[in-house]
């Protein structure tokens, strides 16, 4: 399998002697561009549903493929909260999903998957070992949650947390439009000391592959360089999608975390995300893409993957676009590298677009001086 890759890479290296002399090769087929809407839904076959509860300051986001799709997950945070991620492990029977849920609410938010599963099951969607009258399918709805319980919202819900109902509301009108910032799973999120939010971005390669990301940013770490308004993700910005400040020239003290959260608590922080592509790759390939996409969090948040975070990344493929000619591992590497860059941009966009919900205090990125 690796002979073709070994033979290809030296050839590419010999051709990379001038400015973009490698264009037209499998490594760099030519300049790509941001997708039409710069959202995860630029990936063919996806819609997104969102809902929030302003009183509780929490929300739910659902990524809905038009059919079951291959999926993988990579968990890096020290305090994750997930549902059905084991189903995506190599060697297991079901490595495809009917939907992905990102939710606020910590452990209570895992109940949002109940609403999505009910919605899907009522429409006959799900995994079926047998098709018999009266035997419903089992929708596969992996879910990741973030902690927004201490943001000042009213969490006195007793025996009836709102997440199942929020999920059903999100499924009322799934759309290709995605509200960024204070919306969905990012409604009550906090990114370090700044208001966090829901972010998305996309990229289309010259040979037609699309990669998109959707992320709820609720990190311990800071998304900006200490003492500045510059996003850590600045070098990866395309156009002015999150302010246009670009990279910072500031020297960074290794022990200065800048606008990180003070006095972090275990499982009180988390960045949860979904990567999507239309490239026709399988669950094993998607596992590598999810792993590589974690680099995007490291590019956009400092620190990240701490004992206090529950960082989780799903990666799915709608399979609408065949891989171009060339070694498959090379294309997987390309997709993983793109996923990391797109996710870094999505993180910054989520915080850039965030505003304070009614009654909530604290700084937003737009309120920073300078």
Can you describe what each PLM-predicted range is?
Residues 1-21:
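N-terminal export signals
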Residues 24-107, 111, 122-370:
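A structural signal for small-residue-enriched, beta-sheet-centric alpha/beta enzyme cores
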Residues 114:
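Glycine-rich loop at the start of a catalytic domain that most often binds anionic cofactors/ligands
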Residues 117-120:
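Active-site-surrounding "flap" and adjacent substrate/cofactor-binding loops of secreted or lumenal enzymes
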């Amino acid at each position: 399998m690796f002979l073709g890759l070994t033979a290809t890479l030296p050839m590419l290296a010999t051709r990379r002697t001038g400015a973009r002399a490698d264009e037209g090769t499998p490594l760099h087929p030519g300049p790509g561009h941001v997708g039409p809407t710069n959202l995860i839904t630029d990936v063919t076959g996806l819609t997104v549903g969102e809902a929030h509860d302003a009183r509780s300051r929490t929300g739910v986001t659902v990524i809905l493929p038009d059919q079951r799709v291959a999926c993988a997950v990579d968990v890096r945070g020290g305090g994750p909260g997930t549902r059905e991620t084991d189903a995506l492990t190599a060697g297991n029977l079901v490595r495809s999903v009917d939907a992905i849920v990102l939710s606020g609410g910590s452990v209570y938010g895992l109940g949002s998957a109940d609403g999505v599963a009910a919605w899907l099951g009522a429409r006959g969607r799900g995994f079926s070992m047998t098709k018999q009258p009266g035997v419903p399918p089992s929708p596969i709805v992996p879910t990741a949650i973030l902690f927004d319980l201490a943001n000042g919202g009213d969490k006195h819900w007793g025996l009836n947390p709102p997440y199942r109902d929020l999920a059903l509301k999100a499924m009322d009108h799934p759309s290709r439009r995605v509200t960024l910032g204070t919306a969905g799973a990012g409604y009550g999120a906090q990114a370090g000391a700044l208001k966090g939010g829901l972010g998305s971005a996309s990229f289309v390669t010259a040979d037609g592959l699309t990669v998109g990301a959707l992320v709820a940013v609720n990190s311990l770490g800071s998304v900006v360089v200490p003492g500045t308004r510059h996003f850590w993700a600045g070098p990866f910005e395309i156009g002015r999608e999150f302010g246009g400040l670009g990279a910072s020239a500031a020297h960074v003290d290794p022990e200065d975390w800048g606008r990180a959260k003070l006095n972090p608590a275990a499982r009180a922080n988390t960045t949860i995300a979904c990567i999507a592509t239309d490239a026709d790759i399988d669950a094993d390939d998607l596992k590598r893409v999810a792993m590589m996409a974690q680099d995007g969090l490291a590019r956009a948040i400092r620190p990240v993957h701490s004992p206090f975070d529950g960082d989780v990344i799903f990666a799915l493929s709608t399979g609408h676009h065949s891989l171009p000619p060339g070694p498959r591992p090379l294309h997987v590497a390309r997709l993983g590298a793109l996923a990391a860059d797109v996710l870094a941009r999505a993180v910054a966009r989520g915080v850039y677009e965030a505003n304070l919900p009614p009654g909530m205090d604290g700084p937003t990125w737009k309120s920073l001086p300078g």
